[in-house]
Amino acid sequence: MKKHLILLLFLPAVLFSQENNKFSKTITSEDLESIMFGKENIKFSKTIIVEDLEKHLNILASDSLEGRETGKAGQKMAADYIMNHFINLGIPPSVTTENKHTKTHKAGYYQKFKIRSKRHVCKCEDCDVDFIKDLFGVNKWIKGENVLGYIEGTDLKDELIIITAHYDHLGKHDSLVFNGADDDGSGTVAALEIAEAFMLAKKAGHGPRRSVLIMPVSGEEKGLLGSKHYTDNPVFPLENTVANLNIDMIGRLDDWHDTANYVYLIGADRLSQELHDISEQVNKEYIGLNLEYKFNKEDDPNRYYYRSDHYNFAKNNIPVIFYFNGIHEDYHKVTDTVEKIDFKKIETITRLVFLTAWELANRDKRIVVDKIKN
């Protein structure tokens, strides 16, 4: 017991010591100088690299964080790690007001919430639902944090793009740690790298015209609670939110594929045909992944459109794209571990998300919402 407590107290210092450089060690001053010339978007996308993704995930999906269950010590340590990353990138605090619904961390990076959880969202048919319900309990008060990394834009700064991933997972049951390397450690580290790429751009004089909010959320595994709290209590006006790009499970292959050159896109054309077209064009010009839409059909029996954090934005008529690699045999199991992750796959998809966000943030006119449903 004492050894366990010492480990928990010691871990934040270890985590923060690994985040003591303002930017990635892999980016030199010569790199920054070269980035300032030429086609900035693709050059900054290349600062998103396997080595940094792997470094972050080895920490966030380690046993020491005990599965990052919302409300537990491991989730709090993960939140601190993410916040520290934002601070070291030079991202200032953005949350400065408090009311009875939204309490904030003194440094202004946390949006705290306390919500009663009544359900758990399971994304597959064969996961052990009875076990998951027993693990979480029902109708309990959940305390969590969304971590906000706000990168202010220039001439169109009142509008913003929100990039989300959930950093919580299933936690620990008896002696078993559910590391959640793919679900959703993969999306979380992607968000951290996107934040770095945008801040490198800003440092070099190429900051986004629209503001960009990088927001790793918690409470997803409890029923999309963190993102729901944000859309119910937005820090920035929802009417100024151009789009939400949500990243959830991008580090593995599903049973339908034997190569990594694919990603499922869900939701891109549900509210804005223009968002879908931009996404397709960005991929065609820069990345070349196979963009697959089998889970985007309205009659999809899996109903993935309703089952990750983007849906809380879509409910508010904000266009969304959900980036997803599909379900695999280790989903919601203790075997969802770092050594099974394809980091090159994460790198490629993360660059696609960044380049799509770059286009949305820098185009003259915000995308048109032409498919509003009541």
Where are these regions (language model features)?
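Alpha-helical metal-binding/catalytic segments enriched in His/Glu/Asp
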Residues: 147, 163-223, 353
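Metal-dependent peptidase/peptidase-like ectodomains
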Residues: 217-322, 368
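His/Asp/Glu-rich mid-to-C-terminal helical/loop segments that flank catalytic regions of hydrolases
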Residues: 324-374
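Bacterial Sec-dependent N-terminal signal peptides
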Residues: 1-22
